[in-house]
Regions:
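Canonical Rossmann dinucleotide-binding motif of NAD(H)/NADP(H)-dependent dehydrogenases/reductases
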Residues: 2-37
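Rossmann-fold cofactor-recognition segment
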Residues: 52-70
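N-terminal Rossmann-fold cofactor-binding loop
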Residues: 36-40, 44, 66
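Catalytic loop of short-chain dehydrogenase/reductase
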Residues: 95-102, 109-113, 132-191, 197-211
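Active-site Tyr-X3-Lys motif and surrounding loop/helix of classical short-chain dehydrogenase/reductase
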Residues: 60, 70, 74-81, 99-114
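Conserved hydrophobic beta-strands of the Rossmann-like cofactor-binding core
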Residues: 8-11, 89-90, 139
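A short, exposed helix-loop element centered on a Lys and neighboring polar residues
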Residues: 124-125, 180
Length: 211
């Protein structure tokens, strides 16, 4: 694989599953990894594991709750204060509430949609200027094979009975659509946007809450 030495990468949701493996692999390739974590204590534990397993420089842990618009803006503001450029943004943080009832975010939005869709969108918008300063930058949105049809008239489950997996599946369909729209918007620029479907990884909260 190509070296990532000198490349600055933000990964959201890096404390388990897909995000953790991405962080490990990119650190091993020499990338300067920034871990956007809701739980910074877990983030520090992952950073220590990355160092021990890859002999890379210490990843930077920053607090980020992608269900909160304020947290996203604070994260982006702090990043821009410290760094002028960004090479790769990996929007991976996501959630599925399993058998738990519907919950809204601090902004009053159904939590799955707030985290998995609006979180991707807002963080990308907040960091687009620093991505565009690189000659070849990447936005990668982690999607899912479980993406399903949308009910555009009831994305917030205000009329339908809330089903956590349906909420997750429609959020991942939105992520695909978001990526397509973003790719068209960025055509001809130095930034490309792609969605990826990683397959099933069982060591995640999403898998544990699947019953």
């Amino acid at each position: 694989m190509n070296s990532m030495k000198g490349k600055r990468v933000i990964i959201t949701g890096p404390t388990s599953g897909v995000g953790k493996e991405i962080a490990l692999q990119l650190a091993a390739l020499g990338a300067d990894v920034i871990l956007g974590c809701r739980d910074t204590q877990k983030g520090e534990e992952i950073a220590a594991e990355i160092i021990s397993r890859t002999s890379s420089s210490k990843p930077v842990v920053m607090q980020l709750d992608t269900s909160s618009q304020k947290s996203i803006r604070d994260f982006a503001r702090e990043f821009r204060r410290k760094h002028r450029t960004l090479d790769v943004l990996i929007n991976n943080a996501g959630g599925n509430r399993g058998t738990l009832p519907k919950v809204t975010s601090v902004d009053g939005i159904e939590l799955t949609f707030a985290t998995n869709v609006l979180g991707y969108f807002l963080l990308t918008q907040e960091l687009l200027d620093v991505l565009k300063k690189r000659a070849s930058a990447r936005i990668i949105n982690v999607a899912s094979a479980y993406a399903s049809d949308l009910d555009l008239d009831d994305l917030q489950f205000e009329r339908r009975r809330f089903e956590s997996f349906r909420a997750y599946a429609q959020s991942k369909a939105c992520d695909r659509m978001l990526t397509w729209a973003l790719a068209r918007r960025l055509a001809g620029s130095s930034v490309t946007a792609n969605a990826m479907t990683p397959g099933l990884i069982t060591e995640t909260a999403l898998y544990r809450h699947a019953d």
